[in-house]
């Protein structure tokens, strides 16, 4: 388990700072399977997880739902046959916060 996966999310208000370019470089290096996407001007973390069938993809999605509820931080999730696309960003600040990197790392632990 990575250092990030062991951290707790903090409450993120609309005036919370987005990660800086330096923080982004440091944090993304800790979750190398994730990429940064920009949609409608909003920076987001995204990863596609592959599975052997829909049932396994759905089981992963349900584990992720439990994780998101426990941490009060919710991703975009697209569940399809054989894959789940997970997108993390902080809605309140319309961008990336350290919480998103923490949750991405925690999402990776669901495969263990």
UniProtKB/Swiss-Prot annotation:
The keyword Repressor does not apply. Its EC number is 4.2.1.96. Signal peptide: none annotated. It comes from the Bacteria. Keywords: Lyase. One of its GO terms (molecular function) is 4-alpha-hydroxytetrahydrobiopterin dehydratase activity. GO terms for biological process: tetrahydrobiopterin biosynthetic process. It catalyses: (4aS,6R)-4a-hydroxy-L-erythro-5,6,7,8-tetrahydrobiopterin = (6R)-L-erythro-6,7-dihydrobiopterin + H2O. Belongs to the pterin-4-alpha-carbinolamine dehydratase family. PANTHER family: PTERIN-4-ALPHA-CARBINOLAMINE DEHYDRATASE-RELATED. This is Putative pterin-4-alpha-carbinolamine dehydratase. It comes from Shewanella halifaxensis (strain HAW-EB4).
